[in-house]
Amino acid sequence: MLAFRHRLAWRVAPKAIRFVARLLWGFRIEAEAPFPEPPFIIAANHLSFLDPPLVGAAWGRRLKFVTLADLFGNYPLLDFTLESFEAIRVKRGTIPLAAMRQSLAHLAEGGVVCVFPEGTRAARWGEVSPLPGAAWLAVRAGVPIVGMAAIGTDLVFGMDNKLRRGRVRIRIGPAFYPIGSGRAAVDDLTRRWSEWMARATHPDTRSAGGA
């Protein structure tokens, strides 16, 4: 049974985050397509520390984030928050076998897993090549990837970690389903998701409205 603090976190946090983000930055959620039924993987770009809470708020229900282990052990409040949202730890520079097992188990239970394939914050999309982990999980579990593009978070809370005024959005893309198996399927799925992300975050499309 899900622990009380996990249930409480997901009951309260998404609404609170959406409210505060709308108040500060005119936060909007733009959907190109409806979410598929779980299980699935959310794969998002990573411009800012704001991205995980805004992505979680856009989904609005329980999910498990794959999170760098470096974030733990620095601030007790951050540790408590990450643990309340059941973050799956990945140690930098290692093969994340434990994280893979935990992610696959959660997907097998009908859950949603969120991965940031760049593996770290980047000043802009395309600066860091995405890693294949999200696509590998999708192919292995036989579930789709849903793209989420964070837009504007780098302008209001970027690499210098200073808050600024601006507009932020989360754009929700279509579901990308694995085709085939093995490395070819992983590469194909990574390519399709990356191409969508490049379009969603391109300056010519960033200002376009959503559904």
What are these regions, as identified by a protein language model?
Residues A13, G73-L77, V156-G158, R165:
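Short, glycine/polar-rich helix-capping loops at beta-to-alpha or helix-loop-helix junctions
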Residues L24-R28, T94-M100:
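Glycine-rich, highly charged phosphate/nucleotide-binding loops
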